[in-house]
UniProtKB/Swiss-Prot annotation:
Region (Enoyl-CoA hydratase): 1-190
Protein name: Fatty acid oxidation complex subunit alpha
Keywords: Cytoplasm, Fatty acid metabolism, Isomerase, Lipid degradation, Lipid metabolism, Lyase, Multifunctional enzyme, NAD, Oxidoreductase
Major subcellular site: cytoplasm
Reactions mediated catalytically: a (3S)-3-hydroxyacyl-CoA = a (2E)-enoyl-CoA + H2O; a 4-saturated-(3S)-3-hydroxyacyl-CoA = a (3E)-enoyl-CoA + H2O; a (3S)-3-hydroxyacyl-CoA + NAD(+) = a 3-oxoacyl-CoA + NADH + H(+); (3S)-3-hydroxybutanoyl-CoA = (3R)-3-hydroxybutanoyl-CoA
Coiled-coil residue windows: none
Pfam family, one: 3HCDH
Origin superkingdom: Bacteria
InterPro entries per record: 3-OHacyl-CoA_DH_CS (IPR006180), 3-OHacyl-CoA_DH_NAD-bd (IPR006176), 3HC_DH_C (IPR006108), 6-PGluconate_DH-like_C_sf (IPR008927), ClpP/crotonase-like_dom_sf (IPR029045), Enoyl-CoA_hydra/iso (IPR001753), FA_oxidation_alpha_subunit (IPR050136), FadJ (IPR012802)
Family membership: In the N-terminal section; belongs to the enoyl-CoA hydratase/isomerase family.
Pathway: Lipid metabolism; fatty acid beta-oxidation
Keyword Oxidoreductase listed: yes
Record EC number: 4.2.1.17, 5.1.2.3, 1.1.1.35
Length: 715
């Protein structure tokens, strides 16, 4: 074997072969097509060495086993037949591993995902570490695919069909103890003894196949299987709304393997993989994956980042508490919270405690780790402990004079290099920095709620913000586990600007008599996780509508909302889920009761509530306004690229990922079709639908947003 091989064979003195996996020049092990020859050469040596007692596959990387297959391989396939051949080659390689005459053990530390888990499943036994970095799963569905190297066939036979369906249909990842309980691994050990434990397991004679739990055995029988698959199909269809063809194919392939045997199952798996690889949904989902990977590598500016050793936070409310948690518990940075009273500080501390305690209860971390992370967060009602903070995040009320005061106080009480980052959602960063002594160190850092769940942040430099300030802020966002996009300092920034007309139109249709549930269902059918009216309830009607006057003042009537309707709702003390009354009614806190539309909402706004528009018409009216505004943002350079615009919409507001984001979706529709549709809607509903200049120009020139070699492989 050459020194550049990703798979290195070493035979120990005790006649156990250790195959170390180490992809040269990469931080993470991924499976590439060219590795097949390397693996086959090693398997040949193993078969020929009659003295061997066993084989151990183990990673030489610090914190990952195999994170999956290199997705770029799929992009090189010209048709379904080529992708199917790729899957069959993977299946054959895994079959050769499984057919080895001696015990084969996968020793797993870190991420074992996709093709990595399929390789581990081909081994006779699996053993993993108890480290928090160790996760096992088959996430191919998130790319519009299914596991193509035998995963759909081996996993159900190992852990049972219901557990396998749960893992493969949603790409669920199991931690070490969960994997042990499910029967996915045979043992969990500390990392320090992983190799020796795997070697000892390899020396044993092959153990009998694990007996599945009674429930799984019943479900594997003809009657149980028929009932299970009928229920799973129904539940999956309700969840995906038919927008994700991979889920239906996953169910088909697993059922085929169980009903007709593994040979038929492998054949069905390969064919389905090939067909899914060519679907527009998979191409779009892969594009989102590549774009998000690129964004995470983007430093934000050409300047090197400044020091980032500790962070301050002003305000211990909902946002401040969430920001403190991601900074300390994900970023590992010491955090000092300042609030005007101890109640605010205690709220922020409890916020982190609750999240960490949930992890302890679920056995994701130990109590000692919880205490260690919580110790990174401290608080004060003054600026003690702030003098050495490298960056201070302001999360106080949306009040310009107050935020300007915060800038002055930070400049007075912190170091000369300290960056001031405002979490404002609507106020111009330039205005916040207007009186600053060091305006080059003032920037916007807009988080989305709930902070611990939403992956996106907007980084907003104003005209005088330095390149180093941008780079340092982007670096912080990445440490917090966020995906940052840099956007211009214009009203609404990017995400709220494209979201506002979408929600406004939903409210406008409500005033025309359309029913709440019909509007929401139409946009869920289109592919959004929740409908626009439910989203407004979730965000808070008072909070969600606060930005509308700002946008209307900046951009004119196209941002005007039915003001009398919003006022009537707010005057009736309807804030949404947070006070149990919005467009929907909510049960008592903690109850699982299904939310219901409050029929009083129709009387409140003076309509009958009888839907006349089709679901397609409802979705078109909302989505077209969002797309038109996104194109304006591109034209005005609010976003730096179509890539950032797509990621911002998918990660910030749940734009359907199977469409690739608003810009890929507009490219798919074509600029000519976009302009024609907007003109038709403008004739029906008014000038707010007038196509923007950017789209008109692109239609005339037959241009697209994704150009200059930007492909679904992120080149």
């Amino acid at each position: 074997m050459t020194t550049t091989s990703a798979f290195m064979l070493n035979v120990r003195l005790d006649n156990v072969a250790v195959v170390a996996i180490d992809v040269p020049g990469e931080k993470v092990n991924t499976l590439k097509a060219e590795f097949a020859a390397q693996v086959r050469a090693i398997l040949k040596q193993i078969r020929e060495n009659k003295a061997l007692q066993g084989v151990v596959f183990i990673s030489a990387k610090a914190d990952n086993f195999i994170a999956g297959a290199d997705i770029n391989i799929i992009g090189h396939c010209q048709n379904a037949q080529e992708a199917e051949t790729l899957a069959r080659q993977g299946q054959q390689l895994m079959a050769e591993i499984q057919a080895l005459p001696v015990p084969v053990i996968a020793a797993i530390h870190g991420a074992c995902l996709g093709g990595g888990l399929e390789m581990a499943l081909a081994c006779h036994r699996r053993i993993c570490t108890d480290d928090v970095k160790t996760v096992l799963g088959l996430p191919e569905v998130q790319l519009g695919l299914l596991p193509g190297s035998g995963g759909t066939q081996r996993l159900p036979r190992l852990v049972g069909v219901s557990t396998a369906l749960d893992m493969i249909l949603i790409g669920k990842q199991l931690r070490a103890r969960q994997a042990l309980k499910a029967g996915l691994v045979d043992d969990v050990v500390p990392q320090t003894i992983l190799l020796e434990a795997a070697v000892e397991l390899a020396k044993k004679e092959r153990l009998a196949q694990r007996t599945l739990p009674v429930r799984e055995r019943i479900l594997a029988g003809p009657l149980g299987r028929a009932l299970l698959f009928r229920l799973v199909r129904k539940k999956t269809a309700q969840k995906t709304q038919g927008n994700y063809p991979a889920t239906e194919r996953i169910i088909d392939v697993i059922e085929t393997g169980l009903a007709q045997g593994s040979s038929s199952g492998y054949d069905a798996e390969a064919r389905a993989f090939g067909e899914l690889a060519m679907t527009p949904q998979s191409q779009a989902l892969r594009a989102v994956f590549f774009a998000s990977t690129e964004v995470k590598k983007d430093p934000g500016s050409d300047a090197p980042p400044g020091p980032l050793n500790s962070v301050g936070i002003l305000g211990g409310g909902l946002m401040g508490g969430g920001i403190a948690w991601v900074t300390a518990c994900k970023g590992g940075l010491p955090v000092r919270i300042k609030d005007i009273n101890t109640q605010g500080i205690n709220h922020a501390l409890k916020y982190s405690w609750d999240l960490l305690e949930t992890k302890v209860r679920r056995r994701h971390i130990k109590a000692s780790e919880r205490d260690k992370q919580l110790a990174l967060i401290s608080g004060s009602t003054d600026y003690r402990g702030f003098s050495h903070r490298d960056l201070v995040i302001e999360a106080v009320f949306e009040d310009l004079p107050l935020k300007q005061q915060m800038v002055a106080e930070v400049e007075q009480n912190c170091a000369t290099h300290t960056i001031f980052a405002s979490n404002t959602s609507s106020l111009p960063i330039g205005d916040i920095a207007a009186n600053a002594a060091r305006p080059e160190q003032v920037i916007g850092l807009h988080f989305f709620s709930p902070v611990e769940k939403m992956p996106l942040v907007e980084v907003i430099p104003h005209a005088s913000t330095s390149a180093q300030t941008i780079a340092t802020t982007v670096k912080l966002a990445k440490k917090q586990g966020k995906t940052p996009i840099v956007v211009s300092d214009k009203a609404g920034f990017y995400v709220n600007r494209i979201l506002a007309p979408y929600i406004n139109e939903a409210i406008r249709m409500l005033t025309e008599g359309e029913r709440v549930e019909h509007i929401d269902a139409a946009l869920v059918k289109f592919g959004f996780p929740v409908g626009p009216i439910q989203l407004l309830d979730e965000v808070g009607i008072d909070t969600g509508t606060k930005i509308i006057p700002v946008l209307e003042a900046a951009y004119g009537e196209r941002f005007s909302a039915p003001a009398n309707v919003v006022a009537s709702i707010l005057n009736d003390d309807r804030k949404g889920r947070k006070n149990g009354r919005g467009f929907y009614l909510y049960g008592e806190k903690g109850r699982k009761s299904k939310k219901q539309v409050d029929p009083a909402i129709y009387k409140l706004i003076g309509v009958q509530g009888q839907s006349r528009l089709s679901a397609q018409q409802v979705a078109e009216r909302c989505v077209m306004l969002m797309l038109n505004e996104a194109a304006r943002c591109f034209d005005e350079k609010v976003i730096r690229s179509a890539r950032d615009g797509d990621i911002g919409a998918v990660f910030g507001i749940g734009f359907p990922p199977f469409l690739g984001g608003p810009f890929r979706y507009m490219d798919a529709l074509g600029p000519g079709e976009m302009v024609a549709t907007l003109q038709r809607l403008a004739a029906l509903y008014g000038p707010r639908y007038a196509p923007c200049e950017q789209l008109v120009r692109m239609a005339e020139r037959r241009e697209h947003f994704w150009t200059n070699g930007e492909t679904d492989q992120g080149n």
